Curated annotation (Swiss-Prot):
Record keywords, A-Z: Cytoplasm, Glycosidase, Hydrolase
Locations listed in the record: Cytoplasm, Cytosol
Upper taxonomic lineage: Eukaryota, Viridiplantae, Streptophyta, Embryophyta, Tracheophyta
Cleaved signal peptide residues: none
Protein encoded by which gene: ENGASE1
Role this protein plays: Endoglycosidase that releases N-glycans from glycoproteins by cleaving the beta-1,4-glycosidic bond in the N,N'-diacetylchitobiose core. Involved in the production of high-mannose type N-glycans during plant development and fruit maturation.
Enzyme class at the top of the EC tree: hydrolase
Protein source organism: Arabidopsis thaliana (Mouse-ear cress)
Name of the protein this chain belongs to: Cytosolic endo-beta-N-acetylglucosaminidase 1
Region (Disordered): 1-21
InterPro entries in the cross-refs: ENGase (IPR032979), Glyco_hydro_85 (IPR005201)
Length: 680
């Protein structure tokens, strides 16, 4: 009986070789010192593309909320920069409750995957990477790191350079090992120099010290601000306290910190390991105490909900857990604050992908970079059949992306129901604004948008955007706002209205559920179902104009064909594009990438798309000006592949495919050996 030999081990990861873009940490001081990360094929893909939502310098002068990721060791589904197919991956969407997000792993230098920085920045949340040393290996690392004052400064500068280049906001420093007391002065140099360089290289840069090693070099978690850890606190932007503190520690720490009490972040371990209040479903007990003690909080490992598979399902359990945080801590972010404003309620994962109501793909996907501004939905426990349940739903139809807000339940004939969507602080001028939103509903359900305003004299106004036939019913309750509506072929209705409210501030956006006037059923209470696909607010004076296809240079690099079965091949290549003459307003948040197979009769290179010849297949979304096509199967009859790059605007608009830049890669004849070609 013969035994098949074991399959060969995959070759070790070589970051300099072309492959599907991933995020990864830096594991050694040598790699940090050599700056080898910048030579990686993956580096350009790992740059975040979304600046902090507003120019936030110093953090707000109030108790703040820091959230430390720590989910299954880090770099799971989120390591795939262009996304992956696991739509059951871990995500966070309650960004309006937090000020700072830390991406954590146990590698020496944890670089946040760009998806977290992109979506956190979109919501106004700062993002930190982690520098950690632990136990005996960490002691040896620190001995090298802190050998001289110059080495301490050099490594600090390397960390600051990485944050600036990749677009995140700073570092959590966690030295969890003993330090030779003689090296403590150089540790102080490392922390103070890193703080100084971060402040000068990244606007609003932030360095936070973890309560671990003490000023005498002992590994002794203090759990509060003391003379043993305060010297580190004094030379950086804050301290993340270990999570085994006692009831009186927060107030005592606030007294010692004085004017910097909000820079003290008391740790809460959501797993409940020795943490005050027990963590888990009673994490709010600790939050309540910290709020009353007038210090900040640091939530560690909220992925507990996901890792322990809390019932009934991740989505429900996640919303329930974060609702406890909201009740204790309150909302700390407001958006929108500037125009344009756009949200399609995308949570960064879904079971399909749509554009303008048309499905581009039925494939499940996960890409947190695609998460749009998240609604401030209120969590209501229990499925009360007599009320309307409001949820973000990735299974039902989407107008754009893979999400929507779903309204399901029962509603009486003459009743209405409102649900909070956003808490803006949007100052309006004399310039008219346009508001768009898309709805898909059954004939018995009507969905509108309710806007709340505050005048310069603090007078409150509410304006309901309703179709013309419904104005009489609600005119005595709200100021009516006429809509124009356009039906799409996919069953979505896109509503539009224009407003001028000079000097007013938009303070809330809500959904408004009601029944149509021409309801024929005699039953008083009926099932209600409607989907809200997107909402967009933009200035009429700034209509998006997309560059012509001829304005772009698009290239293919690292083109590789590998023979497959029955004459087929796989194609891998890196697509890159740039404007020939970039302008100030030529920065785009994302690009949709498509591929179109060309037979011999269809193949001819051209600069501009003409009549569509064959189906263009959606490949994915890029958030930088490059996309890696990995092992795409090309049939034996295909002579060329046309790649199309569709530019998308921050107002939710997109360039028509026929006007988008494109490039044809000619399919080579390949033998049984690997065949590669270079620049197309």
């Amino acid at each position: 009986m013969s035994v098949a030999p074991p399959a060969p081990s995959p070759p070790p990861f070589d970051p300099t070789k072309p492959s599907t873009p991933i995020s990864f940490p830096i594991k050694t001081l040598q790699d940090l010192k050599s700056r080898s990360y910048f030579d990686s094929f993956h580096y350009p893909f790992n740059r975040s593309s979304v600046p902090l939502r507003r120019n936030i310098g110093a953090l707000s002068d109030r108790p703040r909320l820091l959230v430390c990721h720590d989910m299954k060791g880090g770099y799971v589904d989120d390591k795939w920069v262009q996304g992956c197919g696991n739509n059951a991956g871990y995500a966070i969407w309650d960004w309006y409750l937090m000020d700072v997000f830390v991406y954590f792993s146990h590698s020496l230098v944890t670089l946040p995957p760009p998806c977290w920085t992109n979506t956190a920045h979109r919501h106004g949340v700062k993002v930190l990477g982690t520098f950690i040393t632990e136990w005996d290996e960490g002691k040896a690392t620190c001995k090298e790191l802190l050998a001289t004052k110059e080495s301490a400064q050099m490594y600090a500068e390397r960390l600051a350079e990485l944050a600036a280049a990749l677009g995140f906001d700073g570092w959590l420093i966690n030295i969890e090992n003993v330090i030779d007391e003689v090296q403590i002065p150089n540790l102080m140099v490392f922390v103070s120099h890193l703080t100084k360089v971060m402040h000068s290289s990244v606007p609003g840069g932030l360095v936070i010290w973890y309560d671990s090693v003490t000023i005498d070099g002992h590994l002794a978690w203090q759990d509060q601000l003391t003379e043993n850890n305060k010297p580190f606190f004094d030379i950086c932007d804050g301290i993340f306290m270990n999570y085994t503190w006692k009831e009186n520690y927060p107030k005592a720490s606030a007294e010692i910190a004085g004017d910097r009490k909000y820079d003290v972040y008391m740790g809460i371990d959501v797993f409940g390991r020795g943490t005050y209040g027990g963590g888990q479903w009673t994490a709010n007990v600790a939050l309540d105490l910290l709020k009353s003690s007038n210090v900040s909080a640091a939530i560690f490992a909220p992925g507990w909900v996901y890792e322990t598979e809390q019932p009934p399902d991740f989505y429900t359990a996640q919303n329930k857990w974060w609702s406890l945080v909201e009740k204790s801590w309150g909302i700390v972010q407001t958006y929108p604050q500037v125009l344009p404003f756009y949200s399609d309620f995308n949570q960064g994962l879904g079971s399909h992908t749509s554009l303008g109501g048309r499905k581009l793909s039925e494939a499940p996907w996960y890409n947190i970079s695609c998460q749009s501004l998240q609604p401030f939905l209120e969590f209501n426990e229990g499925r009360n059949s007599e009320t309307i349940q409001v949820t973000v739903d990735g299974r039902e139809a989407s107008y754009n992306g893979g999400g929507n807000v779903s309204f399901r339940g029962k509603l009486k004939r003459n009743a209405h129901f409102t649900a909070r969507l956003f808490k803006p602080q949007l100052q309006l001028s004399a310039a008219p604004i346009s508001i768009f939103f898309s709805v898909k509903s059954d004939k018995r359900s009507e969905l509108s948008i309710l806007l709340h305003f505050s005048s310069p004299s603090q007078e409150k106004k509410s304006m309901l955007m309703v179709p013309n036939e419904s104005i009489n019913r609600f005119g005595d309750m709200f100021l009516p706002c006429l809509l124009t509506s356009k039906q799409t072929t996919s069953g979505w209705t896109v509503h539009e209205t224009n407003l001028v409210l000079d000097g007013h501030t938009l303070t809330e956006i809500s959904a408004f559920c009601s029944r149509p006037d021409d309801l024929t059923e005699e039953t008083n209470t009926l099932e209600y179902f409607a989907l809200l696909g997107h909402i967009s607010i933009k200035s009429q004076q700034k209509a998006k104009v997309y560059p012509l296809a001829s304005s772009w240079v698009i290239e293919a690099h690292h083109v590789k064909f590998v023979p497959g079965d029955s004459g087929s091949k796989t194609l891998s290549c890196k697509l890159e594009w740039r404007l020939k003459h970039p302008e100030e307003d030529s920065v785009f948040p994302k690009y949709n990438v498509y591929a179109e197979n060309l037979s011999s009769s269809e193949y001819r290179p051209r600069k501009v798309m003409e009549e569509p010849r064959s189906e263009k297949v959606f490949l994915g979304t890029a958030h930088v000006d490059a996309y890696y096509v990995s092992e795409m199967v090309v049939g034996s009859d295909v002579k060329g592949v046309r790649f199309v790059v569709q530019t998308c605007g921050e107002d939710g608009s997109w360039q028509e495919l026929d006007a988008s830049p494109n490039l044809v890669v000619e399919v080579e004849r390949v033998s049984s050996k690997l065949c590669c070609c270079g620049l197309i």
